[in-house]
Amino acid sequence: MSLEQLVTINDLNVDIGKQLIKIARDSIKNRFKLVNLNLDEYKNPVLNKRGLAFVTIEKIEDERTSLRGCIGYVEAVAPLKEIVSKAAVAAAFSDPRFPPLSKSELNDILIEVTILTKPEEISVKDRWKLPSFINVGEDGLIVEYGIMYSGLLLPQVASEYCWDSETFLAETCIKAGLKPDCWLNERVKIKKFNGLIYREINKNTDEIIVLRPSDIKCKKSQHSNLQ
């Protein structure tokens, strides 16, 4: 697949973000038979290009939010609108860290869609220099070892926890089920990617905010699960 076939950050704008958020929320509501979802209605050419995306669901509790689900896809196997729809349903009902979302929770959640660039492997002979190749606030990370171990952390996670690049590497290793220093092993693949974030402000309107990971403020005390 050529890069030209993939959605890029430069393809995106606020209107596309609003449509992606609506697709995500309506995909969840469709499971409860509250709406009839028809992805064919979304004609924007960008939405019909292949894309990579994660959907994060946060639950509002006592004026704070906590993670309620986060699932995504780093293989561009379908149009962006389909990837976001599938990721939203998976985040709501198939994240193994949480019970399936209930109908009663629909009014207490906010949805975030992160569009990813194509992951690229970081190639460096001296593994101790790996942290210097990672830009916290811009890069997300993937750790892969063989076919059994894989872990991904979105770029905004490092910003939210105020991590440095070495801590980010260690936490991604842990997410993959490996030791924190796995990134020093030459057989472990380290990939990085960028992302653009669309976040609901209010579930009752189509108003959203567009964020770069570097815009995210540290709020580590509010998190109990990693994305």
Swiss-Prot record:
Family annotation (InterPro entries): AMMECR1, AMMECR1_dom_sf, AMMECR1_domain, AMMECR1_N, AmmeMemoSam_A, Uncharacterised_MJ0810
Signal peptide residue numbers: none
Pfam families named in the record: AMMECR1
Domain AMMECR1: 15-209
Cited Gene3D superfamilies: Hypothetical protein ph0010, domain 1 (3.30.700.20), Hypothetical protein ph0010, domain 2 (3.30.1490.150)
Coiled coil: none
SUPFAM superfamilies registered for this protein in UniProt: AMMECR1-like
Protein name: Protein Saci_0792
Organism: Sulfolobus acidocaldarius (strain ATCC 33909 / DSM 639 / JCM 8929 / NBRC 15157 / NCIMB 11770)
